Amino acid sequence: MKKKSFSIVIAGGGSTFTPGIVLMLLDHLEEFPIRKLKLYDNDKERQDRIAGACDVFIREKAPDIEFAATTDPEEAFTDVDFVMAHIRVGKYAMRALDEQIPLKYGVVGQETCGPGGIAYGMRSIGGVLEILDYMEKYSPDAWMLNYSNPAAIVAEATRRLRPNSKILNICDMPVGIEDRMAQILGLSSRKEMKVRYYGLNHFGWWTSIQDQEGNDLMPKLKEHVSQYGYIPKTEAEAVEASWNDTFAKARDVQAADPDTLPNTYLQYYLFPDDMVKKSNPNHTRANEVMEGREAFIFSQCDMITREQSSENSEIKIDDHASYIVDLARAIAYNTGERMLLIVENNGAIANFDPTAMVEVPCIVGSNGPEPITVGTIPQFQKGLMEQQVSVEKLTVEAWAEKSFQKLWQALILSKTVPNARVARLILEDLVEANKDFWPELDQSPTRIS
């Protein structure tokens, strides 16, 4: 019997990640057939440059797929089975400010962590809710697979503000680290490992890694990470210097709890001074991306569109993003795939807030995810997570209530911020920088000396 084929819209069609994801989808058509693929963005000029290349890819590799790029929500979201969302409200220019403003005060400037992550979250909530509402209006049976950052804040916003929506929040960072673990172990794929992991998004720990026969792989991995971080003896592909530093720093992060293996983002919370020291406030990661990947992808897309051929293209398939197909297949075909998702705790972690959005392994089928019970977690992780989940909840409350006070409290609670005064100074700058993107906050009347 012929498999059903699906209609997909990629929300954030103008993203520089879109071409690699489209190539990945075209590479997995046997497992996940597609009849229609649409790109949606509110920036027509940007999306058109990406879409020109994607149109060529599809005509060359799968001409039967109906392709469209649109800025019209009704056209984009009508007759779709899956919405794949990777939006960036404010683009990289705003990310640069998210990073630069905290650094001005000697505080971590990072895309998803600390004040920068809070600022990005405040911009992202409205955009993700808007896409979710379009999907429910025009294709009420569809599922939204959201990998827009900052995933923790976005997931809390959808839990609180759209509690009955068919949205799955997923992150690629654990996937990327597990790819590196597989390389370290000499395995051909991360899928040869069975993992146990818990935490919040960008804030978690692996507690068990086994092979398919049940052999414990943790001792070998822990020994390697304690010496080299997540850097394999031989790299499978070239890694940017800033990412190389991150993977090496896992050595120090792991030392805080040698019984587990950490998510690399914990470096920003456990070693914030080190992160600030190696940052350039005038040239942050956002600048690197704009000058590097963004310039490269757009020049490649322009060339492909001009030549109407991908023969000379250097854009690579984003194999790393194949987890998106795994997730879509799990929903479509009830595969029972085991995946890390960001879901409401609801007892999965016994001694933690039941309403917190936690990142844990789930079994995914046609009705969505079923979290695998983690049990009781240690005081060290519990304490860190309680502080961080409070930051996320207060940020969403601040957005919903337009509350300056609650947003200030979120920054005060962030482990990256040293005190309330610095939190206030950063927030006042962020409010000014984000006036075109955030809700207008009720300016707190309370002044500090």
From Swiss-Prot:
Which cofactor(s) are needed, names only? Mn(2+); Fe(2+); Co(2+); Ni(2+)
Q: Which reaction does it catalyse?
A: alpha-maltose 6'-phosphate + H2O = D-glucose 6-phosphate + D-glucose
Q: Cite the active-site annotation.
A: D172 (proton donor), Y265 (proton acceptor)
The protein's Enzyme Commission number: 3.2.1.122
GO biological processes? carbohydrate metabolic process
What GO molecular function annotation could you give as one example from this UniProt entry?
A: oxidoreductase activity, acting on the CH-OH group of donors, NAD or NADP as acceptor
Q: Which residues bind substrate?
A: R95, N149, R285
Q: How is its activity regulated?
A: Cellobiose-6'-phosphate and 6-phospho-beta-D-glucopyranoside are not substrates but competitive inhibitors of GlvA.
Record text on cofactor binding:
Binds 1 divalent metal cation per subunit. Manganese, iron, cobalt or nickel enhance activity.
- Could you tell me what induces this protein? By maltose; repressed by glucose.
Q: Which GO terms describe its cellular component?
A: cytosol
The reported effect of E111 to D/G is: Loss of activity
Entry superkingdom: Bacteria
Q: Where does NAD(+) bind?
A: 6-72
Keyword annotations of the record: Carbohydrate metabolism, Cobalt, Glycosidase, Hydrolase, Iron, Manganese, Metal-binding, NAD, Nickel
Q: Where is this site: Increases basicity of active site Tyr?
A: E111
| Pfam families on file | Glyco_hydro_4, Glyco_hydro_4C
pH curve summary: Optimum pH is about 7.6-8.4. Stable from pH 4.0 to 10.0.
What InterPro entries does the database record attribute to this sequence? GlycHydrolase_4_CS, Glyco_hydro_4, Glyco_hydro_4_C, Lactate_DH/Glyco_Ohase_4_C, NAD(P)-bd_dom_sf
Subunit info here reads: Homotetramer.
Could you tell me what this protein does? Hydrolyzes maltose-6'-phosphate and trehalose-6'-phosphate. Is involved in the catabolism of alpha-glycosides accumulated via a phosphoenolpyruvate-dependent maltose phosphotransferase system (PEP-PTS). Is also able to significantly catalyze the hydrolysis of both 6-phospho-alpha- and 6-phospho-beta-glucosides containing activated leaving groups such as p-nitrophenol and does so with retention and inversion, respectively, of the substrate anomeric configuration.
Q: What else is known?
A: Reaction proceeds via a redox-elimination-addition mechanism consistent with an E1cb-type mechanism. This includes redox steps involving NAD(+) and stabilization of intermediates by Mn(2+). Because it hydrolyzes 6-phospho-alpha-glucopyranosides without activated leaving groups (such as maltose-6'-phosphate) but not glycosidic linkage of naturally occurring phospho-beta-glucosides such as cellobiose-6'-phosphate nor methyl 6-phospho-beta-D-glucopyranoside, GlvA is certainly more appropriately classified as a 6-phospho-alpha-glucosidase than as a 6-phospho-beta-glucosidase. The ability to hydrolyze beta-glycosidic linkages is exceptional and applies only to activated 6-phospho-beta-D-glucopyranosides.
Q: Which family does it belong to?
A: Belongs to the glycosyl hydrolase 4 family.
Q: What is this protein called?
A: Maltose-6'-phosphate glucosidase
Naturally occurring in which organism (per UniProt): Bacillus subtilis (strain 168)
What lineage is this protein's organism placed in?
Bacteria, Bacillati, Bacillota, Bacilli, Bacillales
